[in-house]
Amino acid sequence: MHRSYRRVVTGHDKNGAAIIESDQVATQTLERPNRPGVRLTNFWITDQTPAEYDGPTETCLGPLTLKPPARGSVFRCVEFMPEDPEVMAQLSSEDGAAAFAEMGAGDNVVRGGRHPWMHRTDSVDYGVVLNGEIWMLMDNEQDDVLLKAGDVVVQRGSNHAWANRGTEPCTIMFVLTDGVTSSGEGKGIPLRNGN
């Protein structure tokens, strides 16, 4: 069962005193039938760096997209229910592409990847596992890692997928920041889908 999140946003009154501008349940959520058991909730989005702290009170408007805006960031929570192995066995990267297309990121899926939702974003993502446990799958199985409550991950534009193979839900808080590759560093980061 997915939960609701109270979101408190601070600001300033006309005299510059600190106030609470908004105190309500976060409403920008996304659940998709072609990505069963996963729910995303956005809390805040910025569209520039440095970010404005005296701008609008509500930034989570329009459709929920996977990646942050250019030069921006997204603060979000993702809840992963345990995966059903029978359902997973029937899915392919084409199913993953369809699910990610609903978030404006169909091209982010790794075609023929190890997991239907293996993907990559051009971003640096900071994640904190709040509860449960989850496998972070990489291109090669020997690099997979089991993350547990209290673990943090810094995802730097690499192919990955999330797989909850346990029996309890897993919740991860993320801050996604727009990113670029450093040219000439010799990291050998492959172009996405051969492009």
Model-found features: residue ranges?
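Non-heme Fe(II)/2-oxoglutarate
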Residues: 48-60, 65-69, 178-194
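N-terminal leader/capping segments at the start of a protein or of a new domain
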Residues: 1-60
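A short beta-strand-loop-beta hairpin characteristic of the jelly-roll/cupin
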Residues: 113-121, 126-148, 187
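A generic structural signal for residues embedded in beta-strands
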Residues: 21, 136-137, 154-155
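Conserved short histidine dyad/triad with adjacent acidic residue
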Residues: 25-27, 75-121, 156-159
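Double-stranded beta-helix
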Residues: 8, 12, 18-20, 29, ...
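Terminal, intrinsically disordered low-complexity segments enriched in charged/polar
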Residues: 47-66, 74-79, 87-90, 98
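Ligand-binding loop in jelly-roll beta-barrel domains
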Residues: 72-74, 144-151, 157-181
